[in-house]
């Protein structure tokens, strides 16, 4: 039986920052290989990752671009030697992602004739300010106009057949380099996957498919009024320790951006016995009065 792989990459984090990602994978019954590429990370952190059952690959940053984009260089250089070793590959952001189930189960049942799966953020590009402006800035208005009616796809969760994921990471690195915006990977991902042949190779997973959810658009309370009128599906909900799709009541395989919801963050802090620091849900001192509405 072919093996599957979950692989991540991060820079400048300590172990606590990635512990929820690591622990959730270990608790998901995933039976494949687990790899973390680490940059500017202490020996102690690398040791703890190794002790948790992950292969650790320390790398040195080239220091010329944001890690959002640089990670794809390291992912490609690892995967290009493994194209025939793995069946499915899943690569995600590390700091704000947890797995609720083994991704192998969903992929084996749902990928079918497709080579890749991309997770929808349940909103059209033209209705989400950051993605709209980011795509225009990086790729111009003509390409933006070509894809603006499509839903936003999240580059923080990439999965599919090994060769397809490998070559996609190479394309994302090249398309993200030397762009006008300092974060260009999401724009590159949304442009690329709407073009041939990627548009034929990629399954777009909606919330009702229970593959992955991205909480920043759907569930961040401070932006309910901004995004609410434009959501293409109902907001996911939290029940019995799991984030679920409203329509099907099925738990998602992957939860992304859980730190945008204070109650979810608090739950995962207790579950994984770690302090989760987030700019989106900072600690609130009850003795300090604030007019801020984004906490």
Write out the residue ranges for each language-model feature.
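Catalytic core and acceptor-binding pocket of nucleotide-sugar-dependent glycosyltransferases
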Residues: 147-267
